[in-house]
A protein has these predicted regions:
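Nuclease-adjacent, charged terminal/linker segments that flank catalytic cores
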Residues: 1-106, 112
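Active-site metal-binding core of divalent-cation-utilizing nuclease and nuclease-like domains
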Residues: 18-20, 92, 117-134
Length: 134
């Protein structure tokens, strides 16, 4: 059984974060794998750095953004980590916080968490007093 699937993903190499063209830390310049021309694309990076996983020279997995309202063509979803002692081995790490929220929600809906079955109600990203809980 699959719980969640990312479709239409591409791999890419981060060349600059923040972007040289858009100085927000939530945008990175990325060269997409498999493209004829090496063109830097603006890519939304919804998390800040992730302990060095979203920095220059790092490989990532991206999803395509279809909205005309954004300057970014893709969103960074996952990081690819390679160990020094075993560089052929890829460790894929989720770095988009929304992915974690979506997967947790699906687990609740499908009763995948022992001790948290048949949940009647829940809310995502709920404010508590003057702060928000993620």
């Amino acid at each position: 059984m699959y719980l969640f699937s990312l479709t239409g993903v591409k791999r890419g190499l981060i060349t600059s974060r923040p972007s040289k063209r858009c100085k927000t830390p939530y945008v990175a310049d990325v060269i997409l794998d498999g493209e004829e021309k090496e063109v830097e694309e603006l890519c939304h990076s919804p998390s800040l750095g992730c302990c060095g996983l979203v920095e220059k020279g790092k490989q990532v997995i991206l999803s395509e953004l279809s909205s005309d309202k954004t300057k970014c063509s893709h969103r960074v979803e996952l990081a690819i980590l390679r160990e020094d002692k075993n560089p052929e081995r890829e460790i894929i790490i989720g770095i988009n916080p929304k992915l974690g929220e979506t997967i947790a929600e699906l687990c609740l809906q499908k009763n995948c968490i022992l001790g948290l079955t048949n949940i009647q109600s829940y809310r995502r990203e709920t404010k508590l007093l003057n702060s928000s809980l993620w």
